[in-house]
Each structure stands twice: as C-alpha cells, then as structure tokens.
C-alpha cells in the first residue's frame, strides 16, 4: 500500500484543488489581472481543453506564454493540465508538483495573502504525506521546499499580517526539519534554516508571537541537529589536531525574510529552487565537505522565471545542489560558530541582550543533548573550550545585566557538569574569578578596579547558579579536590571553594551580598558534611585505620606547598629554583635530561618566559637540545610544529636567543621526519610527506613564520604582509628550491586565521583578561588525545580510597566548617535551622572521630557542652545566648500528692527547660558520647565538662545518683543519698490558683510559678531521654583513667554554706562512680593506687557523718581487694579506723548487711596473695576480730571464717599468730556461758512442775561454743610442729572451758580435754619428754586457778578424773615412771579430804596395780573405759544438764559437727 493511501481523497485531487484555490485567489488579488477579459478567461479556463487532443492542448497552453499573462497563474494551469491525465503521482517528479507553490513563496511581488495560501497548501502536502519516500525526487523536493521557505518573499502590508505569514513559514520549516525527511537536508540548507529562524528569533521588531515561535523552533532544530552527533562516527583518535582555525567566519545575517528587503532587490528574484549558495554560507573545506557553489543569473522578469520553471520541468533534471550529502558535522560546527558570534565579547555591541541570552540558551541546549560526545570531535570541542568558554568567563566577569549573567552561569554549570574533566583549566580560572567577585577580592584581577565590589544582586545570582554543582552532586567537592587540589599544576580549587563558602555562609556576609546568599552557601557546606558522613557509614573505622599504603596522589598533594615554593623560586631565578627542585626530589638529578623532562612535563606553574630565557642561554645548549627532543614533530607542517613547540614556553625577544631555539627546533624537526626522497613532488597537494626541507630550510621557514605571525597580528602594523609578499620572500629556500605553493598557502592561511599565542605578552597592563586567557589556552592549542572514558573519577574509587580524599579535605576545611556552623547555630532563631546545624555538627564530630582529628572532635564537643547551659562557665561564654539570663532561685522540691511525683525546681532546671538549644545540645552531646569507640579521643577539658554537667544535674536533683545499682547490691549498700532541697512543698494539685499565689506571696512562700514548674518538667524529660548514665558509663570505651581522675578531682574537700546541701551526698556519689568505673579497668595498677589514695584522703574530710564514713569503709575494702600490695592502706584501715573508731563501727553497724559484707571482704583478703601474710601476722587484725566477736552477732561469722581457714589451710597458723587465734577461739568458746541462765531457769521450772514449751534461747551460742571447743582441740591434729608452750596453751584453753558456767559446755570441755590429752598428744615429743610435764603444764594451772576453787566439788573431781585417766593411759603404754605416780599422788593428796576424791584415788591405785599385774582392767571399770571416744561425740544443746534430768532429756554427746 502506498504511503499516500491513508487519505480518503486521492492526492491528485488534493493538489488540483489547491491549484484551483491558488488560481482563484491570484485572479482576484494579483496585480497582473489588468489584462483583457478574454485573456483572463482563456488563461483561467484552459482546463476545458485539458481532455482534448494534444494539438488543442498545446495551442491553448501556448497562450500562457504571452507576455501579458500572469506567469505564476500559468504555472498552476500547466500543473493542472499535467495532473488531469494522471491517476496517481507515481510517475511525476515531486519537485514538478511543488514548483508553482515554491515560486509563489519565494517571489517578493506576490501579496502576503497569496503567499499564505501557498504555505497552507505546502503544509497540507507534507502533513498528508503526499510527498514521501515513494515519490520521485522526494529528496530534491524537500530540499527545494526548505530552500524556498528560507528565501520566502512577499509584498508587505500590516505588521501582524506579515508576521502571520512568517509564522506559517516557521511552523512549516519546523515540521519538515523535525520529520524523518529533515535528515535528508544538506549542510547548506540546514545552515540557511538556522540563519533564517535565528534572525527572526533575534529581531525585536517582529511580533512577540513570531519571535517566540522562532525561538521554540530554534530549540527544536538545535535538538535535532545535535542529536545527530550520537550517530556520527568520531574522527580518527590517533590523528593530531592542530587548532589553527579562526572562529569568526560565521555571523548572524540580517532578518531579510518576507518583506524586509531593500527596494532595489524587489525586482530581482533569487533562484526559486535555491540553487544559489553564497560564499559566506559555504561550508569550510576543512570539514571534509566539498561544496559546489552554483551562481545562477537573476531573472529580470516573470516570463524568464517561467521559462526556467518550464525548462526544469521538462528536463526533470537533478540540480547539483540537491545531490549534496545529508547534513552532519560541518553544519554543527558552523552552527556553534554562529552561536559564538552572538556571545563573543567583540560582538557585544552588535547584538541585544536578548539575542546574546538566546545564544547562550541554544548552546546550553546543544550541550544538554550531546555535550558528552563533543570531546570526540576536536573541532567542536575546541570551539567550546576556547572561544565559547572565553566568552562565558568574560561575561561573568564584566556584565551587570542579571538576565545575561544568569544565562551565562547556567551554561557554565552545564559545562562543568558535562565536560568538567576536560575543561579543568577553564573551570579553575572561572571559579577563581567568581569567588573573587563574591569575596570582593581584587587580587585575582590585575586590571583596574572596575570589576571590584559588584552589586549584591550580582553576587546572589552567582552563588545561586553555581549551587547546582553541589546540589546535583554532593561529591562535587571531593571530585574537584581530586582533579584540582591533588594536581601540582592546578590551584586548590576545592579547598578555596569551601573556604569561600565558610565565609559567605556566615550571617554577616549578607551585608555585602543578600540575605539569600548565606543559606545557599551553608547548604553547600552541609551537603559536603552529609556526603562524607554517608561515605563512612558502612566502613569500619579500624579497617580504615589499618591502611598503611597511602595513595600516591595524596602524597603528591602533601608536597604541593613545597612544589609551589620551588616553582616560585624558579620563576624568580632559575639558578635558585632548580637546586631546590632537585633537593626536594621533584627533579631526579641535576642532569640536563632530568631537568628537561621536568620542565616539559610540569610547566603549568612555571613562568613560560623564564623557561624560554633558560633554554636560550648560551650555556644551556645541551639542556635546550634535550628539551626539544621531547617533542614529536613527525607528520606535521613546520607551522604546526612551531605551534606545539610554543605551547611550552615563550619565545625570547632577542634575535640571537630566537636563533638558538629555532636552530635546535629545526634539527629536531628533521630528525622526527621519516623523509623518503622518492615522494618529493610539487603537485601532491595535502600530502605533507612530499615536502622534505632540510634543517637550514626549516630554520629559514620557521623564522619567517614567527615574523609573519608578528606582522599579521600586531595592531601597530598598518599594512600587513600579503601572501605574495610572504611567498616571494621564501623563494629558493627549500633545499635551494621553492616551497610548493600550496604548502606556503596553508602556512599563510593558518597564521592569518589563528595567531600563535605568545603567553604572558600582556602581563600587568589593561589587557589582563586576554593575558590570563592566552596563558591558560596556550597549553591546550594542540589536542592529541580524545578521551573516550567518560566515567567519573568518583566512580573509579573504592570506598576506602574515597575516604582518604575526604580525610584530606576535612583536615583542611573541617575547623572552618565547624566554626561557621557554630556561628550560625548561635544566632539562629528558627528551631528548624538550629536542628539542622546541630545535626551537621553531630556529623562533623563523627567525621572527626573517624579520621582521628582529636583536637577538632574535642572542640566540637566542648562547644556543644557549653551550649547545654549546664556548665557553670557557660553563662559567661559566648554561647550564653543559648540560655536566657534568669536570676538565682532556691532549689524547691515539689511533691504532687495526687500523682505521687516529685519535681525539683531550680535556676538550672528552669533555664535548661526554657532553652530549646540547651536541650538540643544535651541530647546530641550525650548521643555523641554514647557512640564513641576510641578511649583516647576525649581531652581532659571535655571530661571536665562531662563531669560538671553530671554533677550539676545531680546537685539539682535531676539526675538519679544510683547509676550502678548492681554494685550497691554486691556491696550490700543502700541507695546513695540525694542532695537536700532547700525547700520542700507538697501540692495536692499541679495547678495553682491566683488566690493561692497571692497567699504564698503574703507568707513569703518560695513556691515556683506554673511556668517554672513546666520548664523543670521539660528539663527532666530531656535529661531522661538523653540517657546520660548509659551514654557516659554504659560505653566501655569512655571508661578511662582520665574520666576517673576527673571525677575524683572534682570532689569538693571543704564544706561551706554554698555546698552544705549536697556536700556529703556528692562526695559519696563521686566515690561510688569512681569505684564502679575502676572495676572496668582494674588492671591499671597505678590508677588503682591513685584512687585508693584519693579515697582515703577524702574520707578524712572534716565533718563527715557516721553514715558517710561507714560507706567509705566499704569502698576502701573493695578498692584494697582490687589493688595489689596496698598493705599500707590496709593497715591504716584496721589500725586507724576499725580499732579506733568504735563509736562509728559499732555492734549495730556490723549487724547490718553492709557490715557483714565488709567482714566477708576483709576475710577474703587473707586468701589474697598480696595481703595474706600481712593480715595473718598482724596483731591488730586479730584484735579486731576479737572485738567483733564480743559483739555476739558476728561471732558465728568469725568462727565460720576460722573453721574454714584452719581446716582447709594448714598454713594459716604461724608462730606469730598462734596465740591470737587461740585467744579468739577461747573468746568464742566462752560466749556460751550465757546458757547458764537457761539451765537455772530450766531447773526451777522442772522443780515446780511446769511444763516446758519454749526452747533454749541460748541454743545457738552454746552450739557455737561447743564448735569452738572442738575446733580448739582440732588445733592439735596433724600439727607436729607445735611448740610445748603452744600445746600447753591449747590444753589450758580447753581446761578453761571446763569451768564454763554453762554445764553443757563445761562437761563437753572436760570430755574434749580428756580425749585431746589421750588421743591427740604423743609423748615423748621434741618439746615434752614426760607425762609429768604434760600434767604440770596443762592441768595443774587449772586446779590452782581461783575459778576452780569456787566450785571444788564438781570441777576438781572432773579434773582429777582426767588426770587419773591420762596417767592410766600412758601407764598402759609404758610411758610413765614412779616419779609420774608420785607426782599424781601429790596432786590428789591436796584434795584427799574430800571422800569422793579419796575414793577416786583408791580406784586409781587399784587400776594401777591391775595394769601392772597384767590383769586387764578393774572390775569397777575405769572412767576412761566408760567415756566414749571424742570422735563419737555429738553436740546438742537442747536442755541444760542436771542430775534430775531424765535420760531421754539429757543431751547426747557425739561428734562435733564440722562447718
């Protein structure tokens, strides 16, 4: 199916109808209708004969050639005659169909109304797709149509009417160019379209509707053209491109379309099918397009035009102009040149502001479409990088027109975003100028002061527009730092940028700019902080810290300052600079080769004039030759090679100096060329290899090129050298022959079109701008490499590498950023701004900690701490503005009875509750502390601030002192006391009425107001949410020696009127905190010693209550147990406190859980290797135990300690402490004497016949005494090292309990003593040889004591029985003698008056005889045989022993239960 078949009416009919419409209109309105009626009839009615034979048709058609007929009308008639015979358009040339309409459009004598109708017809043809790909010559048709539209002419009438016609032209051009057929247009035609529409868009005399339509069309055409770059193959990447072209060939022509033409042109018509292409519109041959310029003679009247149309129609020829290639790179370059002409500084007076702005917008559109591909086409990229960018910089620096500046800045930022990596030099210079304007810094501009102190609105616009750089990419500053600041040849753009922002972000900068500038700059700083924070969120700090291999580029960055110093020295004096560069390692050695390589590769900071003077020095010939050899001139013309050469240095001024350089250059140039004599030819144009000059020829030619460059571009030269003059001067100079004509022509044109820039030629005078730009661009004249890698430098970095750059940036600007943020935070009145600032400061602290910038980290936190209003010094600090000034008020604690809550109201609480920033600071401050992971990062000042805040909150009753309840539980301590409020008030309701307030006033009541209570509540809620205790003490990284020492140092040592309210409570609070924290770092011995010393020192503070002293005792014993070998303090504790402060450490104290826990810890020290020996050998320790034992409540625990120690550790007893231990046991054994009271009572009750329901109230004491007696006896077991006096002491201790008032104890002691003497002592020993010694040393002292004499009847009998049994035991063993018996008889004789004792003596004698005779045992049985073994004794104290006690009620004796 044909493309035309989508319309209902066939295309032939549509065209015929349009012909009729045009014919009718022309007959009515054409000025040629003054002919006769018949002629008009015949002329308009020739269609009647269209179906007749050829003869008739020919006859009537010839009528149209009459000179009185309308030639335009005849064209339509002839077209109708042709179409009447056709069923479709397949066999007719498309151009033939369109020619009558195009002739109307391009003829100036036609009225605007007729032209409008022709445009409507053309619009219909293209809209309905009548001319399409299946049409014959459809390419020519489209090209002819566009050409006719761009040369549209008609008779003028009213402005609006004329513009409406042109509006149709614009729309039709847009529809064709935008359509797929637009790609078929040639370079010259597209360029005509651009010129035509752009001239309309820029003509302010046209109506606004037309101009707007033209502008939108230009944008659409721009998009269309530059989109084509995506399909055009780039140039050869290996080809060297020499920028030697002029940029000013293409200029915007006057708006001549339509009626705006000179009267003398009205009678002449341009080629209706657009065969003419003017020289000015020709595409440069350098673009690879050969244009054939066809000049047609202008017709002098309509008849001749008709002849041309008919001739062309009959021949159906293809005109050469339409055989050109489709448009591409050449017209793109021409278009950019055209746009450049609109914005170039030299044309600023030719074009209006609106035109220049529109030109900037179109360039921006082009960049937005294909900017990323421009570097693939050197000719296009050079336009952007040199003249266009130069114009941008010039406008930024000089204009005061806001709209123009805005458009320029938008284009600049687009260039930075898209081509930033390829335009570093230009961007550096531009940003430097922008910030010098913003900061009113004229040092960056050596010109006059006209550019200083720009209006505020200009500065606002500058900063608004460049803010897109960091808004679009938060990593902009990091990437800029990598590209510029880490480059030795570039300025510190990123750092200077950020430093400028820190100044401009301050509120006071609004005085020289506008109010909107500081927020915009601040956003830039915040974006940097946010970006760095995001970079490190997923990176482990330890992993980052383990990096050892620093990046080479950062090492270079660190040496940049040194490099600049060296280059400055070189620029001043090479003899001074080169040794410095060698010394610093920038130049490998002092060899000419190394020096040459350095100057070649690092010449951006070097003064090019200085380099030139150094190279041309007579003594530096070797250096010059080494330097020149570094260039590669192969395949280049001599002028191109010189251009490359002079990008590196400035040619000196003296002829001898120039000669040395040119001579070295000539030699090197010839060495680089691979000459082949067989290729030498004068006719091979464009083939440089056919021209092979020797060194002398190159020398002459080079010198001539330099002279030509000076002649053509020196404004003082009035008559410039012509090509004929130039070529004539070089006759016979090419190997004694002439240089080829074409070769010299290329050189001459190159120098004429593009000056060889000599850097620094205008330094310091009024041409500062040109000087700065020429210095910059001279090094980019030659493009030898096309960068296809468009990947951002940020994308190539690993996260760890990126952080290294962030660290380098933050090290430079971090303090400035933090200072700026704080300054803004201080004066900010908006809560949102305050929150944003403190959040950024929080991130800054994280970044500082991550990068280990300790000073900055501490500065941030100290400043935040001062802003909390909780530090005493903060009221005098600059941040005191964060809190309102509020007069002092007493600390009032209000208890609300209905809710059972307490609220402390104080000056600090109210101030804190009313300060939003204070609360904000507090929350952030402790959040930072909570996340800390570096135990060494906090400074002493910061710790002091932290402790001050904690103590302030504690003193104001806002912070609970019980931070370590586990420690209190472990030490059996009660909760810490809280400071006392100055006033306590109970309230039934939380609201207070007016009458109540007035009554309080009359009474002098200190009750706070509702507002103050509300503020205090806020304070408490904020402190609670800050979770201070967990933040500081819950993070082990925070628990350091510095914190502990700061806490102890903050303890007040003197009680006065100001601190009496909280003095002791705070002292305990600090000490308990210190000890709890020390548990986390108890391995630090010196710290433990310091704490112990400080606690002992504080415990001696005057005026401490007993409660405080007692609590400190617990702290001390814990500290001593944690520290190693602190016997000095342990001795002080026992001697100076436990023994001397009996009024404090009373029986009641040791009865408490705290006292019991203290004893346990004291006992545990005897198991410590550090204190065991000291305690066991310290008499005062045992004295203290005896003292505590006397308190009865603790006797059991002390016995348990002794029992456990003696039975599990045989080494506990020493010669030094044996008697102390024995005395302590005897003390415990004697405690059961109180059981005598129960025995007496029990006896009375039983004698009176009362039933006994209650138990023995002294049962525990009796049982403890029995256990102690048993333990005393145990001392003789497994202890063969006892001395005689120690054995006697044990026997005497047991014997002493035989006279215990409590019968149960005394009888048990008798049995134990007898068993001890019989079973646990072996005679003889080293110390004791006979039984007599045992009896005399152990038992006789008891018989002779006054206590024994008081109850002779019971005790003496018992003791004598023991003596008898012991004697008989040893008699059986054969260890007695007559002296032994005589000794015993003498003992009995003292008490023989007692009949019972006499009987015992008689029994003894009988038993002795029986043993001696070997008769076994006495018939009566000895007491020894009747006494059970002590190992079978069981102790039980249920009832007192009495002769009348029933056997069932008497206590049974068996083993003593071991604890």
Curated annotation (Swiss-Prot):
Q: List the disulfide bonds.
A: none
State the InterPro entries in the record: Mon2/Sec7/BIG1-like_HUS, Sec7_C_sf, Sec7_dom, Sec7_dom_sf
* GO annotation, biological process: actin cytoskeleton organization; endoplasmic reticulum to Golgi vesicle-mediated transport; intra-Golgi vesicle-mediated transport; macroautophagy; regulation of ARF protein signal transduction; retrograde vesicle-mediated transport, Golgi to endoplasmic reticulum; secretory granule organization
An example of a Pfam family matching this protein is: Sec7
> List-wise, which residues carry Phosphoserine?
46, 284
Specify residue ranges for compositional bias: Basic and acidic residues. Answer: 1447-1459
Q: Which domain of life is it from?
A: Eukaryota
Give the way it sits in the membrane.
Peripheral membrane protein
Role = Activates the ARF proteins by exchanging bound GDP for free GTP. Plays a role in maintaining mitochondrial morphology. Stimulates DRS2 flippase activity.
Note, other: Present with 7700 molecules/cell in log phase SD medium.
Q: What is this protein called?
A: ARF guanine-nucleotide exchange factor 2
What is the organism of origin for this protein? Answer: Saccharomyces cerevisiae (strain ATCC 204508 / S288c) (Baker's yeast)
């Amino acid at each position: 199916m044909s493309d035309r078949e989508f319309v209902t009416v066939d295309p032939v009919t549509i065209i015929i109808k349009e012909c009729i419409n045009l014919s009718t209109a022309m007959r009515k309105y054409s000025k040629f209708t003054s002919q006769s009626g018949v002629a008009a009839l015949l002329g308009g009615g020739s269609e009647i004969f269209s179906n007749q034979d050829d003869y008739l048709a020919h006859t009537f058609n010839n009528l149209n050639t009459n000179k009185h007929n309308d030639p335009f009308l005849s064209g339509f008639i002839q077209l109708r005659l042709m179409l009447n015979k056709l069923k479709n358009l397949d066999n007719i040339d498309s151009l033939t169909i369109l020619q009558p309409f195009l002739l109307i459009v391009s003829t100036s004598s036609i009225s605007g109304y007729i032209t409008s109708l022709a445009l409507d017809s053309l619009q219909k043809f293209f809209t309905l797709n009548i001319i399409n790909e299946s049409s014959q010559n459809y390419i020519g048709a489209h090209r002819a149509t566009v050409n006719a539209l761009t040369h549209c002419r008609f008779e003028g009438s009213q402005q609006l009417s004329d513009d409406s016609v042109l509006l149709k032209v614009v729309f039709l051009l847009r529809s064709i160019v935008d359509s797929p057929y637009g790609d078929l247009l040639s370079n010259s035609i597209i360029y005509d379209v651009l010129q035509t529409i752009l001239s309309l868009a820029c003509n302010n005399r046209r109506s606004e509707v037309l101009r707007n339509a033209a502008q939108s069309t230009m944008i659409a055409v721009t998009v269309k053209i530059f989109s084509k770059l995506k399909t055009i193959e780039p140039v050869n990447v290996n080809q060297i491109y020499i920028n030697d072209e002029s940029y000013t060939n293409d200029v915007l022509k006057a708006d001549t379309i339509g009626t705006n033409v000179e009267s003398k042109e009205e009678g002449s018509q341009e080629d209706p099918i657009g065969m003419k292409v003017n020289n000015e519109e020709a595409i440069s041959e350098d673009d690879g397009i050969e244009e054939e310029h066809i000049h047609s003679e202008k017709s002098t009247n309509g008849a001749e035009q008709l002849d041309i149309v008919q001739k062309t129609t009959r021949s159906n020829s293809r005109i050469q102009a339409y055989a050109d290639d489709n448009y591409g790179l050449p017209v793109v370059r021409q278009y950019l040149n055209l746009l450049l002409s609109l914005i170039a500084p030299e044309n600023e007076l030719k074009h209006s502001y609106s035109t220049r702005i529109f030109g900037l917008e179109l360039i921006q559109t082009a960049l937005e479409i294909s900017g990323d591909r421009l570097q693939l086409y050197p000719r296009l990229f050079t336009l952007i990088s040199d003249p266009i960018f130069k114009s941008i910089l010039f406008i930024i620096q000089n204009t005061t027109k806001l709209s123009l500046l805005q458009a320029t800045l938008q284009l600049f930022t687009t260039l930075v975003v898209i081509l930033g990596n390829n335009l570093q030099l230009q961007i550096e210079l531009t940003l430097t100028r922008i910030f010098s304007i913003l900061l009113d810094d004229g040092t960056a501009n050596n010109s006059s002061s006209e550019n200083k102190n720009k209006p505020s609105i200009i500065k606002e616009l500058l900063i608004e527009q460049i803010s897109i750089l960091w808004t679009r990419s938060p990593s902009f500053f990091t990437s800029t730092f990598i590209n510029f600041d880490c480059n030795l040849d570039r300025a510190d753009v990123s750092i200077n940028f950020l430093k400028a922002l820190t100044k401009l972000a301050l509120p006071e900068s609004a005085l020289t700019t506008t109010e909107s500038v500081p927020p915009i700059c601040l956003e830039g700083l915040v974006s940097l902080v946010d970006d760095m924070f995001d970079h490190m969120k997923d990176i482990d700090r330890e992993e980052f810290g383990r990096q050892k291999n620093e990046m080479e580029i950062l090492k270079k960055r660190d040496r940049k300052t040194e490099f600049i110093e060296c280059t400055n020295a070189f620029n001043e004096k090479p003899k001074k600079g080169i040794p410095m560069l060698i010394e610093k390692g920038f130049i490998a050695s002092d060899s000419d080769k190394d020096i040459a390589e350095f100057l070649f590769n690092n010449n951006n900071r070097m003064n090019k004039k200085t380099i030139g003077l150094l190279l041309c020095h007579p003594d530096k010939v070797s250096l010059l030759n080494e330097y020149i050899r570094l260039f590669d001139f192969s395949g280049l013309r001599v002028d191109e090679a010189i251009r490359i050469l002079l990008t590196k240095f400035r040619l000196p001024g003296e002829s001898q100096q120039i000669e040395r350089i040119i001579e070295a250059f000539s030699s090197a140039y010839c060495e680089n060329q691979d000459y082949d004599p067989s290729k030498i030819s004068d006719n091979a144009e464009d083939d440089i290899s056919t021209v092979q000059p020797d060194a002398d020829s190159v020398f002459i030619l080079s010198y001539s090129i330099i002279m030509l460059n000076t002649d053509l571009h020196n404004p003082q030269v009035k008559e410039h050298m012509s090509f004929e003059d130039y070529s004539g001067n070089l006759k016979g100079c090419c190997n004694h022959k002439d240089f080829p004509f074409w070769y010299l022509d290329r050189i001459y044109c190159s120098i004429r079109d593009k000056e060889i820039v000599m850097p620094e030629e205008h330094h310091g005078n009024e041409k500062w701008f040109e000087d700065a730009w020429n210095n910059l661009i001279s090094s980019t004249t030659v493009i030898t490499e096309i960068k296809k890698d468009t990947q951002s430098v940020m994308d190539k970095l690993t996260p760890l590498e990126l952080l290294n750059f962030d660290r380098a940036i933050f090290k430079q600007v971090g303090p400035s950023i933090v200072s700026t943020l704080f300054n803004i935070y201080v004066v900010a009145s908006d809560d949102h701004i305050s929150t944003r600032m403190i959040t950024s400061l929080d991130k800054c602290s994280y970044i500082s900690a991550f990068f280990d910038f300790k000073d900055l980290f501490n500065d941030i936190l100290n400043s935040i701490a001062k802003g909390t209003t909780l530090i005493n010094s903060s009221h005098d600090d600059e941040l005191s503005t964060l809190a309102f000034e509020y007069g002092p008020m007493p600390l009032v604690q209000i208890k609300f009875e209905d809710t059972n809550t307490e609220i402390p109201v104080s000056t600090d609480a109210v101030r804190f509750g009313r300060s939003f920033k204070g609360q904000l600071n507090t929350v952030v401050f402790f959040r930072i502390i909570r996340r800390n992971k570096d135990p060494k990062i906090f400074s002493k000042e910061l710790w002091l601030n932290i402790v001050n805040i904690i103590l302030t909150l504690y003193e104001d009753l806002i912070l609970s002192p019980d931070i370590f309840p586990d420690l209190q539980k472990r030490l059996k301590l009660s909760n810490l006391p809280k400071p006392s409020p100055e006033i306590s008030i109970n309230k039934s309701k939380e609201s207070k009425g007016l009458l109540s307030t007035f009554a309080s006033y009359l009474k002098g009541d200190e009750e706070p107001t509702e507002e103050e209570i509300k503020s205090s509540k806020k304070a408490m809620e904020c402190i609670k949410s800050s979770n201070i205790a967990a933040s500081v003490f819950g993070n082990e990284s925070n628990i350091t020696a510095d914190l502990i020492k700061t806490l102890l140092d903050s303890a007040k040592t003197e009680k006065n009127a100001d601190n009496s309210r909280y003095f002791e409570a705070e002292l305990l609070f600090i000490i308990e905190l210190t000890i709890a924290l020390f548990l986390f770092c108890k391995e630090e011995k010196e710290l433990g010693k310091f704490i112990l010393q400080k606690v002992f020192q504080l415990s001696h503070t005057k005026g401490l209550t007993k409660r405080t002293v007692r609590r400190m005792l617990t702290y001390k014993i814990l500290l001593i147990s944690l520290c190693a070998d602190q016997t000095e303090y342990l001795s002080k504790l026992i001697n100076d406190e436990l023994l001397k402060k009996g009024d404090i450490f009373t029986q009641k104290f040791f009865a408490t859980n705290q006292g019991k826990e203290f004893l346990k810890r004291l006992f545990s020290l005897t198991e410590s290797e550090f204190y065991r020996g000291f305690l066991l050998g310290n008499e005062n320790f045992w004295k203290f135990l005896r003292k505590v034992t006397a308190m009865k409540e603790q006797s059991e625990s002390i016995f348990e300690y002794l029992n456990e120690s003696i039975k599990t550790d045989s080494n506990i007893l020493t010669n030094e402490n044996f008697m102390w231990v024995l005395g302590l046991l005897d003390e415990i054994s004697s405690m059961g004497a109180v059981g005598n009271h129960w025995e007496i009572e029990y006896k009375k009750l039983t004698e009176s016949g009362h039933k006994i329901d209650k138990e023995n109230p002294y049962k525990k004491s009796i049982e403890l005494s029995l256990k102690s007696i048993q333990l005393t006896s145990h001392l003789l077991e497994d202890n063969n090292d006892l001395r005689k006096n120690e054995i006697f002491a044990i026997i005497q201790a047991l014997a002493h309990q035989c006279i215990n008032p409590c019968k149960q104890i005394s009888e048990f002691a008798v049995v134990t003593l007898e068993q001890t003497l019989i079973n646990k002592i072996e005679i003889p020993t080293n110390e004791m040889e006979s039984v007599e010694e045992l009896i005399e040393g152990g038992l006789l002292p008891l018989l002779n004591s006054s206590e024994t004499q008081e109850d002779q009847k019971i005790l003496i009998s018992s003791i004598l029985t023991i003596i008898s049994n012991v004697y008989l035991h040893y008699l059986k063993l054969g260890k007695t003698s007559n002296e032994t018996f005589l000794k015993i008889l003498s003992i009995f004789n003292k008490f023989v008056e007692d009949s019972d004792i006499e009987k015992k003596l008689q029994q003894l004698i009988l038993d002795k005889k029986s043993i001696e005779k070997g008769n076994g045992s006495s018939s009566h049985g000895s007491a020894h045989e009747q006494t059970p073994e002590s190992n079978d004794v069981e102790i039980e104290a249920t009832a007192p022993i009495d002769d009348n006690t029933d056997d069932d009620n008497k206590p049974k004796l068996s083993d003593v239960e071991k604890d």
